[in-house]
Amino acid sequence: MLGKVITVANQKGGVGKTTTAVNLSACLAALGKQVLIVDIDPQGNATSGLGINKADVRYCIYDVLINDISPIDATLPTEIEGLQIIPATIQLAGAEIELVPTISREVRLKRALEVIKDKYDYVIIDCPPSLGILTVNSLTASDSVLIPIQCEYYALEGLSQLLNTIRLVQKHLNNQLAIEGVLLTMLDARTNLGIQVIEEVKKYFQDKVYRTIIPRNVRLSEAPSHGQAIISYDPRSRGAEVYTDLAKEVVGI
């Protein structure tokens, strides 16, 4: 197996980060890949968005990071063939503080994933919307980072902090970390603003910007409340189409 680890990160909330982590993972699995999604966001939206009832979870990513539970024991199946998840529960909210005195705290996730990543073609990590120790763990454990950017006026605001964090991780913790790509999300095709943002982001990131752009899509925003990825909830929707296109870009088809 390829065992490629990709973190989906942006410390700005509401940019389509979890939507992208869930639907990219599901679409990679639909292409026949073996995929693990790791939910490391205390809100646990990727977990509930894939239909996992948090009350039924025995072990989550918190147990892996803090209690040295094997990631194999924390992995659960989803309704999508080829897609498994290490879930997050509210316990994870305390992990940032609990990790502070821990030796080698930045590499806890990296060490855990080394045990299992070769069982998968792709491991996709859904980060919290912050640049704390959980995000640093994710970047340290990853081969690359995928950055979703919303097509809005302040699109690039705050990105310098994320890019600076990536540079620090590259320098001190993971010199192999690369930018996988930049994904434009929530495009409203009716506005000129979206077109301006696309041009601005392409000027800044050049060939790192994916050809696929995620539009605003009602079905895409409805799917998580049904505990389903878009390809399960409405496989014929525009949302399913564009995330399938993104998965093909990531794979190189």
Predicted segment positions?
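P-loop NTP-binding core
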Residues: M1-I253
